[in-house]
Regions:
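Transmembrane signal-anchor hairpin modules in multi-pass inner-membrane enzymes, especially those
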Residues: 1-70, 121-134, 166, 174-180, ...
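A membrane-periplasm/extracellular boundary helix in multi-pass inner-membrane enzymes
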Residues: 86, 146-149, 154, 165-218, ...
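Interfacial juxtamembrane loops and adjacent helix segments
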Residues: 90-95, 226-268
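Alpha-helical membrane-protein architecture signal
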Residues: 209, 222, 256-264, 302-305
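Canonical positions in the second alpha-helix
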Residues: 396-397, 430-431, 463-464, 497-498
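Register position in tetratricopeptide repeats
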Residues: 417, 450-451, 484-485
Length: 525
């Protein structure tokens, strides 16, 4: 019951009272529920004298799989409702299926995590025809939703899980090994195919991985730190595009906060050290499974395999259900080791778990309250309220969110709208140092222009344009800046560049910029 609450909250929790009500609220809700249920269940186990001798039921497939079945069903039902048009996904890129997430990647991760547990439950049904009917329905439903959400990575992850189950049913050891080898070759071939087949998407991935390689080469041993990717990626992307001879890649460059590959993220943030530690963990887990094979450990390995494949093309660890799935999968893989621990050791581990859960609540609850206050301030500012109350609210929250680039950016924006451009520059610069991205560079350029620091504005407009060459706004800002400074030759040069620039997305803003540039160039001939 406790695990079910955490799993369900990981997919349904949503609020409009937080700056990021779709993802952050899922983490906060699941975190509070997890810590609370751990404390309550541990206390109850002591009171009822079941404590460390509770037996293996807590780590059984049924106990662990049912919560993921519930979470998966919620995602499937929500997705089907969106597919019928009864409820809209309201996503700007036109995705029809989001199921309460901010991105189709959330749907893919939830289904990839839940699917192996659903198959494990179906496999335990006694009637053969019911078993195969449930499995078939699960496969068809999941594949259909992943196809509609355009998640090739999700389909590949589910396909790997299906093939692992097929191989698992083979009784002959030699045949099973041959089938496993074929599976490895097949997965490798599909991964290569997915990396090169869809030209636009995979050219974008190639750009990101190329920039990641540059970052890795600069810090190969220990990486750039915990948030190194978000701090430095866009600056590296600007340099990469400066020396890039391709005309395609600049058109694909965008504001990037994740490399769309969890392994690349580990390599950039933690270097070879992180990759080696990850590899050691994988090898130890596989070795333990091979030496202690059971139904429980096999289910755990299929979950880990699905997440591992999905991590090559997406960011499943952005979502709390993935983390919960990994923890439960590891419990199943190491179930025999855990059950063989002495009563004293298990009691000690339970005590440590309770203390960690209490510490988690002490940290999470004030953080959730601060997030709620920030959400209220954000709503007030979005409604046009840049008054003293909003500014005082941001000032009070600053010590708690001084390392959050999104908060600092919001704070700077509110200050700028209130006319306090010098203070806005300070917080925007802090945000840019924590997360160098296109939006903050453009804000710093506009703010410096308002302050009359035109040389700084020029540099940030140029940087924003180098980060995302496909965007028209930085060049137009530079065009207007040169016009105000009376630098006619440079103004005409930028104007011609704007007029001859390929348009990736035809919008009202782009048409307005093009018409304004044409008119001003005619006037200044």
């Amino acid at each position: 019951m406790a695990l079910s609450l955490v799993a369900v909250l990981s997919v349904i929790a949503y609020t409009g009272h937080l700056p990021d009500g779709q993802i952050m609220f899922k983490w906060l809700s699941a975190g509070i529920a997890f810590c609370t249920t751990v404390i309550i269940t541990r206390i109850l186990s002591v009171c009822t004298f079941t404590g460390a001798d509770a037996g293996g039921n807590a780590y059984s497939i049924r106990t662990i799989a049912i919560p993921f079945l519930m979470a998966g069903l919620i995602v499937v039902i929500h997705s089907l409702i969106q597919m019928t048009g009864v409820a809209s996904a309201h996503y700007p890129d036109g995705f029809r299926v989001l199921a309460g997430f901010d991105n189709p990647a959330g749907v893919a991760s939830a289904l990839a995590v839940s699917f192996p547990f659903v198959i494990a439950l179906a496999d335990r049904l006694k009637e053969r025809w019911i078993r195969y009917a449930v499995m078939g329905a699960a496969v068809c439903g999941v594949i259909m939703i992943l196809a509609v959400s355009r998640s090739r990575a999700g389909i590949l992850a589910v396909g790997v899980v299906i093939l692992l189950w097929v191989i698992h049913t083979i009784k002959d050891a030699k045949t099973r090994r041959i089938a496993a080898a074929i599976l490895a070759v097949l997965v490798t071939a599909v991964v290569v195919y997915m990396s090169f087949h869809k030209r636009g998407s995979n050219s974008g991935r190639a750009l990101i991985l190329g920039v990641c390689w540059d970052m890795f080469k600069d810090a190969p041993l220990t990486g750039h730190g915990l948030h190194g990717f978000r701090s430095w990626y866009m600056l590296y992307q600007a340099e990469y595009l400066d020396r890039c001879a391709s005309r395609v890649l600049p058109m694909l460059a965008d504001n990037i906060t994740h490399p769309l590959n969890e392994y690349a993220l580990v390599a950039v943030n933690f270097g070879m050290s992180g990759l080696i530690i990850l590899m050691i963990g994988v090898v130890i887990t596989i070795r333990h499974y091979l030496w202690n094979q059971s139904e429980e450990s096999f289910v755990g390995m299929t979950v880990l395999a699905g997440i591992g494949v999905l991590s090559m093309f997406s960011y499943p660890f952005r979502y709390p259900l993935t983390v919960l799935g990994v923890l439960c999968a590891l419990l199943l893989v190491y179930r025999d080791t855990i059950m063989n621990l002495s009563v004293r050791t298990r009691a000690l581990s339970s005590a440590v778990t309770v203390m960690m859960s209490v510490a988690g609540l002490v940290l999470i609850i004030p953080w959730a309250r601060a997030q709620t206050i920030w959400g209220r301030l954000s709503y007030m500012s979005d409604s046009g309220g840049y008054n003293k109350e909003v500014l005082e609210g941001y000032h009070k929250l600053y010590p708690k969110f001084s390392k959050d680039p999104y908060f600092l950016y919001n704070y700077a924006y509110v200050l700028s709208e209130n006319g306090e451009h010098q203070e806005a520059e300070r917080f925007a610069t802090e945000s840019f140092n924590l997360m160098s991205n296109y939006d903050t560079a453009l804000f710093l350029a506009d703010n410096a222009k308002e302050c009359g620091i035109l040389d700084i504005a020029e540099e940030y407009y140029k940087l924003a344009s180098r980060m995302c060459p496909v965007r028209f706004v930085p060049l137009y800002g530079l065009f207007c800046l040169y016009e105000n400074m009376g630098r006619k030759d440079e103004m005409r040069e930028i104007g011609e560049k704007i007029l001859t620039k390929p348009v990736k997305v035809h919008s009202m803003d782009v048409r307005h910029i093009l018409s304004q540039v044409q008119m001003k160039l005619l006037i200044n001939q």
